[in-house]
Structure formats: C-alpha cells, structure tokens
Amino acid sequence: MNNLYFEPSSSTPLVNFCADGRLLIEGRSLPENVTEFYTPLIQWAAMLKVEVVRLDVNLEYQNSASSKKLLEMFKVLDANNNIKNLIINWHYEADDEDALESGQIFEELLRRAEFRYHEYSEAA
C-alpha cells in the first residue's frame, strides 16, 4: 500500500497518511468540492492493513461539509477489522470550545476509537 500525501492549500489541509499507520490532517478544510477531496482519503482508510493507527487531526477550521466527510472517514477507520487500536489525537486551540466540542461529538459517534485531546496555545 502506498502512502497518501496532499500539499495544503488555502482551502484544503495537509494530508500525510503513511501505510505504517501514522496519519495526519492539518490546516484548513473548506474545499470547493468536498467529495472530490475526501473520497481518496476514505478509500485509502478502507484499505489500510495495520493493527495500530494514530491519526493526528489539527484543523484550525473545518466547514460542515468537511465535518461530515471526516466523520465518514473516521467511521471507515473504526469499522476496519484490520485495525485493532485506533487512536485519534484531536488538537485544538485553547480558546476554541467549538473545536473541542467537534472532537467530542465525533468520539460519541464511534465505537472503538480512542480520542486523546491536545490543547495548544497560539504562538504570539
């Protein structure tokens, strides 16, 4: 299985998915065509064949369409029988309660994923 890498843009996040189970989504997610952007990520997640997955999500902004596709991808990872341990590291800015709440909502909707919350302060 090949790694999956997308350079970030002003409207799409950095994606760095390694076949060894280290996954990263970082930046802003408001693509013009959310289905076109997230479909390769979801398909890749469905084919992943590792026992431990560590997904770091560090999104400074995500629109509602992106949130729906993220949930779809999380559910695919959660249902992937090859994965025995799914850890989602949810990074959020200290004063961004909405971002924290988004992670908590995702966590409630998944069966097996272990969410770990990481608060950070924006550098001055």
Feature-to-residue mapping (PLM):
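A generic hydrophobic-segment detector
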Residues: D96-A124
